[in-house]
């Protein structure tokens, strides 16, 4: 018994771990028997005290934490600020989500930490406190839910629900919180049931793998070890101690020249403390990995037995102990999830706080600016950064580790405890994260713009997926798109005037043709379909683009204002009406469409005009088929070469098609929600109700196809035949049958008179039948003579220009054509190709310039198109901007950047009254704004889309017209329809006066109000429209621009005379500029909304509302620049790392994944950096002769270590301590097999055979030849099925297969393991049954190992490894593995 002087007197509360330590001390001091006596007394004392205290639990014992109120309030305040930043476009959705999760997680953690001190101060003998903090019942997180806050919950997939439960269970939950809480509770119940069985099965498999591992030797004689170093403080001291205690040293440990520990000495607590104090060299220890026994283990490699603290006894079944010690905690932990189920546990980053008030200084050269993952600006330091904080009397030095974010600027004043840096926490992120795609959807409809370049990958030239190279904003410029229920097309191009009867603003039908129909005979609109093609990406091919819809009920008129040829940006197309007087043929409903490039310059062989012949026009949908001549539809993407915006023909595609066929079918496109009154594959007659408000126009067979958000209903007219089974009609696509073919039916046979189209249809569960459909035949002619329409200039000297006619089919062979109700489909287009004789000598005449000449005779104005050949690179002098008479052209080097339009439409003053005379009908002017011809649609700017800013009063409501008392009386403006000469009036504007420009033209208007004729004067309002480059376009005093406040809703930044704009701020407002919300524009800083500047006046600014969305590099943008998006369309896709819930139910599958060696989906993010760090060391290693050998060995060792660390990490996160050696025994079994390669020694092992690693090495030594093999990780199930004992395998899985194979191969089972003996009823070779198998280890050492040849590797290799040992220790310990929680690194062979 020890002396009294060495005993300690403890006077403090002790928990479980402290008791463990005391017991181990007792055993050291007093031995086993006496210790058990002491512990018996402690147990009795505990029972007595518990009986005397008799803890009871009531609801009043749950004391809530007083500081909870303001903590939650603070978190809500932070969330609110975050929401604002997101709204202003400073952070994007992911950063917002991340930060809000961390805000609430931190709040919840603070509350949890407050709990213990709160109980201690207010009521130390509180039963809840006593039970949970002594560890007797419950743990901190459970009590935290009762008295703190329940916090963030995870759904059944382990994903986080970002709405926190702020109440605790004592206060009670609101309805929403209760529903969210049920998620977690259900998860708890399910996990308890399901995962417990999983944990049990895991235990069974683990025991199966290692059941034969028994301690059968004292020393295997290995010289290898694994080095553990506590240097640099990489490994936490606690883990370092756990790793070393109970192990055996593989090498002597020296302190200077003095040896402080010898080889094969086991390490106790005293020795570890000496290692820590002396900070010795890396300590080499023996582990099960290094044991040289093939199918068992030796005492020294295993180390101390955890039961009695001495070296493990011979014959102990350490394998089964290892399997159970890993499997059992899983079972326990899954049971525990029942209570805390679903509560989210994650990690937050560590912060560095300032030690005192003062000014902070650091080296600017070592940091570069970046964004944190919450979207805050910060500096990233790539190496250790030394920061000094100078207060009045003292200078503090703080070191910030590499890869951290510095959140303050140089020379900034910081306060004490202010967060100055955030350390990137590498520990928790690796284990519980996953890569997730997050789509951001548009909140409103409008036009998309972005403020940066985007990458177009070469293969995606035509697609709408773009990668962002840098952080930028996407803007959605608001505007209601007009989706008409009849024709979803844009009637006019960008920046047009709109005259009589365009689309009504509601999403309705095309408004009635004019009331005064006697004067206005017809109106013609030609347009291009907004193709929402079947491909999701909305990529248009040109055939869709060039297809025209000529509406059946709107005809061209020969009124002159209709042939004002206005220049359009992007694709300039002009309508020249056919005079029906000239052409008496079928040409009254058609027109020629001239397409002029943006810069007004034609190249040779380019398409000059289109004409759509009415005889090739169909009202219904259908399919085109050609006769089988090798023919191409000309309009393919790659066939049309765009040369500087000009479409050119390639002559090789001008082949003749004699005839083609059109198979008609009726197509109805219905919304997804519509209720059908007919069934699929049924036959209906004419005028059958299809839906509530649709009737069929033809009879026939119905086919219904459901697509995304819509249904397609097709009606095929024709006869139905039921063929015999032998009929070989193509199952999928139909076939054309020419006249005269005999069609055999089961009852009759008849000759086909016309062409028919036969299509086989197989309804589900019914007999298939054949549908015979009628076919329309079109013969191809040369089209009409378009050249007559463009007579050449008589004064021309040489006849140089030629116009050539080409016909082509607009649709591909067999391509379904979908028409829209009440519109016609053009099947063949006639094309006019411009050509001229190239002068062989001079290469400069390459291009023809086109412009319009307008001649006015007696008030009649005619437009002529003039084409002349010009030498390229000659710029013409432009006329002045306001000169109405001059005509000018611009040079071709930058047509898109200039603000003078080459086709400037000249309004002469005589025409305005004339047009007033001709159109005295009701007129509605609607707004069109579309800059993107590829995706046609219209946008109407209405009251919700623009706003006005008044510096004095801020934003006011527009519902009331306020009388304004300014110096000039305001003429009231009514929102009514008026004749063409006036602008559209503006309703609900209270102080609109300052929008009026200096030329105020008073117009007499007749307004019908309550059947009274009022004479009233109104002011004509004038607007400017800017183009993309910020230039003002279309500033003509008489034009009515497209931006009219129709339903009146834009936002005006109105200037009051009392407040002048700041000179500096005003100068920076440009047209087209994007302004974020809350930018200070005036001295008193009004609250702006975000938008694009449309109109700038001296005293007010009008913005078009726009919403910014932030996108960071690597995000994918969907859609094209200028495309019109609807609410709910996908804008951006982010890929980000999301942390998952860290409870054991997420952890157990991870353990299983590691042990079954399944591939992990995502590679760690830091992989590249790790490899970079390694490169330096690798070059030094590869330089030596045996580098490859070392590399192979290192790979095996390192992969084993990382497997151990991964498993440990999961258990440590749950507070479970498992000794490394248990995991090592299992990992050793997984990694101890190798696969013999093809080119190996085939006379010993067959290629593809699995053999033990040690066995392979022995075979090599015996044969003195190299065997090529690859290391494999087997996984515990496969390892169980590839042992040496077939009885053990058969009792695990696949009994019949294993036994049959063993019988065929004649396998012998030596009954070495435990399981085989249990199955056969023999004595198991462990414990007392082990004695007969004991080895004479002394004899093993005496016999010398003789070889015929001297092994060349032996001496040199030892020296190399010895020489480079320091190198390994340094480079591996620094760089190889994510060091945070690892226990040991590297290896050496001495």
Curated annotation (Swiss-Prot):
Subunit structure, interactors included: In plastids the minimal PEP RNA polymerase catalytic core is composed of four subunits: alpha, beta, beta', and beta''. When a (nuclear-encoded) sigma factor is associated with the core the holoenzyme is formed, which can initiate transcription.
Role played: DNA-dependent RNA polymerase catalyzes the transcription of DNA into RNA using the four ribonucleoside triphosphates as substrates.
Co-factor binding details: Binds 1 Zn(2+) ion per subunit.
Taxonomic lineage of the native organism: Eukaryota, Viridiplantae, Streptophyta, Embryophyta, Tracheophyta
EC number from the UniProt entry: 2.7.7.6
Protein name per Swiss-Prot or TrEMBL: DNA-directed RNA polymerase subunit beta''
Binding site for Zn(2+): 220, 291, 298, 301
A biological process term (GO) from this entry: DNA-templated transcription
Superkingdom of origin: Eukaryota
């Amino acid at each position: 018994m020890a002396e009294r002087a060495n005993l300690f007197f403890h006077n403090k509360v002790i928990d479980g771990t402290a008791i463990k330590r005391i017991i181990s001390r007792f055993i050291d001091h007093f031995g086993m028997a006496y210790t058990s006596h002491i512990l018996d007394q402690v147990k009795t004392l505990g029972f007595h005290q518990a009986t005397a205290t008799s803890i009871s639990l009531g609801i009043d014992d749950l004391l809530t934490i007083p500081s909870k109120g303001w903590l939650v309030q603070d978190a809500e305040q932070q969330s609110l600020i975050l929401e604002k930043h997101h709204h202003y476009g400073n952070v994007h959705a992911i950063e917002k989500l991340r930060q809000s999760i961390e805000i609430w997680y931190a709040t919840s953690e603070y509350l949890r930490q407050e709990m213990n001190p709160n109980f201690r101060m207010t009521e130390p003998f509180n039963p809840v406190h006593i039970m949970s903090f002594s560890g007797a019942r419950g743990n901190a997180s459970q009590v935290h839910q009762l008295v703190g806050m329940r916090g963030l919950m995870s759904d059944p997939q382990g994903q986080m629900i970002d709405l926190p439960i702020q109440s605790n269970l004592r206060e009670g939950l609101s309805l929403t919180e209760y529903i969210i809480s049920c998620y977690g509770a259900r998860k708890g119940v399910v996990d308890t049931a399901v995962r417990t069985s999983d944990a049990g099965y895991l235990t069974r498999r683990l025991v199966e793998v290692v059941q034969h591992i028994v301690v059968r030797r004292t020393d295997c004689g290995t010289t290898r070890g694994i080095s553990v170093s506590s240097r640099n403080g990489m490994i936490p001291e606690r883990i370092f101690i756990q790793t070393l205690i109970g192990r055996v040293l593989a090498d002597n440990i020296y302190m200077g020249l003095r040896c402080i520990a010898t080889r094969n000495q086991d390490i106790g607590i005293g020795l570890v403390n000496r290692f820590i104090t002396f900070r010795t060299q890396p300590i080499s220890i023996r582990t099960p990995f290094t044991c040289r026994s093939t199918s068992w283990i030796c005492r020294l490699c295993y180390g101390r037995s955890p039961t009695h603290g001495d070296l493990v006894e011979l014959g102990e079944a350490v394998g089964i102990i290892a399997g159970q010690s890993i499997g059992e905690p899983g079972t326990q932990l899954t049971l525990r999830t029942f209570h805390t189920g679903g509560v989210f546990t994650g990690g937050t980053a560590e912060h560095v706080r300032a030690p005192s008030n003062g000014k902070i200084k650091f080296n600017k050269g070592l940091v570069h600016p970046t964004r944190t993952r919450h979207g805050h600006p910060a500096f990233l330091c790539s190496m250790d950064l030394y920061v000094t904080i100078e207060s009045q009397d003292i200078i503090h030095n703080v070191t910030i580790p590499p890869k951290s974010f510095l959140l303050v600027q140089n020379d900034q004043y910081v306060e004490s405890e202010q967060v100055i840096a955030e350390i990137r926490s590498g520990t928790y992120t690796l284990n519980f994260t996953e890569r997730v795609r997050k789509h951001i959807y548009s909140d409103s409809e409008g036009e998309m713009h972005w403020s940066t370049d985007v990458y177009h990958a070469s293969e995606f030239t035509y697609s709408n997926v773009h990668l962002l190279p840098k952080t930028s904003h996407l803007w959605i410029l608001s505007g209601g798109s007009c989706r008409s229920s009849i024709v979803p097309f844009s009637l006019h191009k960008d920046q047009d005037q709109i005259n009589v009867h365009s689309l009504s603003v509601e999403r309705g039908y095309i408004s009635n043709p004019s009331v005064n129909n006697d004067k206005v005979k017809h109106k013609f609109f030609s347009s291009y379909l907004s193709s929402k093609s079947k491909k999701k990406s909305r990529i248009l091919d040109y055939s869709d683009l060039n297809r025209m819809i000529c509406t059946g009920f709107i005809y061209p008129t020969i009124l002159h204002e209709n042939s004002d040829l206005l220049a359009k940006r992007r694709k300039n197309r002009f309508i020249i009406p056919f005079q029906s007087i000239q052409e008496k043929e079928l040409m009254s409903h058609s027109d020629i469409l001239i397409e002029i490039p943006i810069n007004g310059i034609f190249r040779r062989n380019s398409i000059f005009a289109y004409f759509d012949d009415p005889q090739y026009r169909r009202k219904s949908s259908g399919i085109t088929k050609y006769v089988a001549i090798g023919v191409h539809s000309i309009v393919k993407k790659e066939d049309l070469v765009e040369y500087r915006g000009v479409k050119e023909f390639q002559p090789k595609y001008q082949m003749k098609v004699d005839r083609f066929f059109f198979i008609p079918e009726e197509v109805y496109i219905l919304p997804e929600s519509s209720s059908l009154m007919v069934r699929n594959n049924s036959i209906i007659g004419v005028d059958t109700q299809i839906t509530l408000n649709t009737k069929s126009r033809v009879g026939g067979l119905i086919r219904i196809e459901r697509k995304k958000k819509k249904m397609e209903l097709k009606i095929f007219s024709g006869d139905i035949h039921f063929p015999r089974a032998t009929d070989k009609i193509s199952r999928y696509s139909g076939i054309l049958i020419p006249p005269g073919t005999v069609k055999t039916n089961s009852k009759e046979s008849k000759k086909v008179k016309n062409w028919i189209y036969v299509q086989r249809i197989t309804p589900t569960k019914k007999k298939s039948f054949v549908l015979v459909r009628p076919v329309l035949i079109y013969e191809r002619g040369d089209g009409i003579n378009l050249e007559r329409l463009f007579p050449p200039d008589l004064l021309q000297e040489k006849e140089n220009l030629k116009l050539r006619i080409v016909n082509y089919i607009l649709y591909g062979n067999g391509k379904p054509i979908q028409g829209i109700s009440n519109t016609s489909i053009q099947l063949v287009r006639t094309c006019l190709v411009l050509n001229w004789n190239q002068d062989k000598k001079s290469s400069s005449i390459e291009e023809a310039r086109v412009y319009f000449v307008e001649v006015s005779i007696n008030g009649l104005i005619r437009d002529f198109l003039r084409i002349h050949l010009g030498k390229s690179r000659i710029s013409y002098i432009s006329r002045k901007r306001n000169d109405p008479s001059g005509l000018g052209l611009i040079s071709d080097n930058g047509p898109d950047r200039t603000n003078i339009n080459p086709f400037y439409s000249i309004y002469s003053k005589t025409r305005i009254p004339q047009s007033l005379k001709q159109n005295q009908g009701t007129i509605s002017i609607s707004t069109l704004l579309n800059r993107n011809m590829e995706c046609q649609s219209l946008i109407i700017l209405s009251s919700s889309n623009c706003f006005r800013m008044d510096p004095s009063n801020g934003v006011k409501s527009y519902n009331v017209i306020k009388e304004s008392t300014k110096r000039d009386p305001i003429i009231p403006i009514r929102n009514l329809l008026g004749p063409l000469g006036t602008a559209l009036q503006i309703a609900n504007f209270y102080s609109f006066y300052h929008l009026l420009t200096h030329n105020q033209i008073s117009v007499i208007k007749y307004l019908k109000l309550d059947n009274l004729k009022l004479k009233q004067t109104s002011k004509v309002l004038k607007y400017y429209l800017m183009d993309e480059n910020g230039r003002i376009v279309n500033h003509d005093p008489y034009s009515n621009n497209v931006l009219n406040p129709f339903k009146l809703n834009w936002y005006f930044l109105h200037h009051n005379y009392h407040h002048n704009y700041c000179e500096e701020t005003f100068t920076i407002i440009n047209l087209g500029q994007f302004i974020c919300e809350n930018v200070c524009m005036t001295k008193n800083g009004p609250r702006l909304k975000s938008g694009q500047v449309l109109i700038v006046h001296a005293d007010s600014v009008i913005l078009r509302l726009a919403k910014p969305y932030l996108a960071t590099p690597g995000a994918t943008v969907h859609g094209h620049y200028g495309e019109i998006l609807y609410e709910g369309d996908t804008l951006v896709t982010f890929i980000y790392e999301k942390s998952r819930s860290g409870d054991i139910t997420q952890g157990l599958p991870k353990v299983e994944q590691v042990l079954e060696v399944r591939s992990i989906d995502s590679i760690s993010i830091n992989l590249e950096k790790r490899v970079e760090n390694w490169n330096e060391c690798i070059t030094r290693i590869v330089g030596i002769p045996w580098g490859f050998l070392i590399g192979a060995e290192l790979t095996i060792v390192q992969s084993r270590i990382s497997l151990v660390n991964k498993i440990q990490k999961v258990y440590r996160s749950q507070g479970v301590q498992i000794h490394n050696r248990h995991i090592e025994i299992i990992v050793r079994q997984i990694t101890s097999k190798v696969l013999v390669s093809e080119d190996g020694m085939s006379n010993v092992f067959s290629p593809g055979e699995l053999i033990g690693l040690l066995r392979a090495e022995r075979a090599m030594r015996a044969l003195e030849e190299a065997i090529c093999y690859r290391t494999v990780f087997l996984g515990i199930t496969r390892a169980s099925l590839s042992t040496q004992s077939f009885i053990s395998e058969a009792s695990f899985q696949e009994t019949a297969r294993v036994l049959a194979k063993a019988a065929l191969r004649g396998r012998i089972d030596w009954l070495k393991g435990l399981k085989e003996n249990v199955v056969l009823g023999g004595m198991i070779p462990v414990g007392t049954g082990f004695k007969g198998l004991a080895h004479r280890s002394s004899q093993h050492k005496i016999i010398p190992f003789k070889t015929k040849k001297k092994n060349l590797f032996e001496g040199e290799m030892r020296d190399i490894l010895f020489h480079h040992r320091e190198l390994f220790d340094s480079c591996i310990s620094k760089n190889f593995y994510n060091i945070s929680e690892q226990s040991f690194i590297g290896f050496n062979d001495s």
